[in-house]
Amino acid sequence: NSVFILNKIGFDKLNESEKYYPFKLDFYSISCNKICDLDLTPFNSANDKYTTLKRSTLTKFLKEKLLSDSIIFNKKINEVKQKNGKIDIHFVDGSSDKVDYLMVSDGVFSNSKSIIEKKFFKQNYYGAIAIRTQINNLDILNLNINNISIIMGSNAHLVLYPINQKKELNLVCIVRKKLEENN
């Protein structure tokens, strides 16, 4: 994950009560029978741990820590090159910029990943909707609220994970709807 980079701008100083460090990733069937788990601790170092938190907490942190002139909005990337330890970004409008780090967060249907990686990525999100909410951990039965839980079904999957030390949970549900053919 990107904690190593975020720590360079002070993420490690963020209030510990606003972060959570899950130990495992648990996989369940749609009927909540546990299939297996993955230990996340081997991916951690002393300073860089697998971390979950509220999206709003991360957004606020980034807005406070990054200079407003270092965030570029509403630009389409045309080309990305690395030269002498810097990243040279060329935009569709003819402008360009040199940066140390490039973070792109423009959605799953963006072509930025294809441009940066210099290969085509086909999106596989047809006929799906995503629902996101936060819930109280008391609402969850039979799941380990200390871990990230993935519940998998044939047309849906749910991901639950703690987002702070109060163990409030994020719930993300992806549902694929089979489209009926018109006769």
Label the model's feature ranges.
Residues 12, 137-144, 166, 180:
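Short helix-loop capping/hinge motifs at secondary-structure junctions, enriched
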Residues 133-139, 173-175:
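Short beta-strand-to-loop capping motifs
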Residues 3-134, 178-183:
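Conserved N-terminal helical subregion
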Residues 37-40, 55, 137, 150-154, ...:
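Generic structural "secondary-structure junction" signal
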Residues 146-181:
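Active-site substrate-recognition segment that forms the wall
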Residues 20, 119, 141-143, 148:
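Generic detector of short alpha-helix boundary/capping microenvironments
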Residues 114-116, 139-143, 158-159:
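A short, acidic/glycine-rich surface segment
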